[in-house]
Design a protein with these regions (language model features):
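Bacterial N-terminal signal peptides
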Residues: 7-16
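Low-complexity, acidic/polar, glycine-enriched regions of mature
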Residues: 19-195
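N-terminal cationic amphipathic segment used for targeting or macromolecule association
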Residues: 1, 15-18
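Bacterial N-terminal signal peptides that target proteins for export
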Residues: 1-7
Length: 195
């Protein structure tokens, strides 16, 4: 049996998608809840002389998916305040001046559809379309996602760029430090299938 499955994706900066197992519910619609403990959001930001690496934690998520129509609903939330690069001074600057994480504590991806099919076994490549709300603004996104289903587990991986300066966040560059205007995000999501 073939089933389409979503995964997000997310995030950001800041963001965004997560994967989980889908459990059958009424009318052929599949339901899923996110496993934040086994999902990761990593980011890299290029800068003169070095590259900044960091992480965010997934806060929560729940999805509903209709394989027949490709319609997907729900939300995946990333805890922006959890952003960590391993350097306290840089992290304080990032949270206070770029992310404004006290004012905007979450980045939320709200998917609306899946393009492509997910097989019940093995790997599948799909695109997940939806809206990313980050730093108080909504941004339409289509995220390529690789989904692997094996036995009772699901793994989803997504890589995408977030143009954070274009999206209204402050460029932390100064006379001595120049950084990229876009951050690369890599999301790995783990879930368990229920039948």
């Amino acid at each position: 049996m073939r089933a389409r499955l979503f995964i997000y994706l997310l995030v950001f900066v800041c963001g965004r998608v997560t994967a989980a197992g889908f459990a059958p519910v009424s009318s052929g619609v599949l339901g899923s809840s996110v496993d934040p403990a086994n999902s990761t959001v990593k980011f890299t930001l290029g800068a003169v002389l070095h590259t900044v690496h960091g992480t965010f934690r997934i806060k929560s998520g729940a999805l509903r998916f209709n394989p027949a129509s490709g319609k997907l609903s729900g939300q995946i939330a990333v805890d922006v305040r959890s952003g960590n690069t391993g350097e306290a001074t840089r992290d304080r600057q990032m949270h206070a001046n770029v992310l404004e994480s006290e004012r905007f504590p979450d980045a939320v991806f709200s998917p609306d559809r899946v393009n492509g099919r997910v097989t019940s076994r093995g790997e599948s490549d799909v695109e997940v379309h939806g809206t990313m709300r980050v730093h108080g603004s909504d941004h339409e996104m289509t995220i390529p996602v690789r989904v692997r289903m094996q036995g009772g587990s699901v793994t989803a991986r997504a890589k995408f760029a977030v143009p954070y300066v274009f999206w209204g966040m402050k460029d932390p560059s100064n006379f001595f430090l120049q950084v990229d205007k876009s951050v690369n995000v890599e999301v790995t999501l783990e879930g368990t299938l229920s039948r």
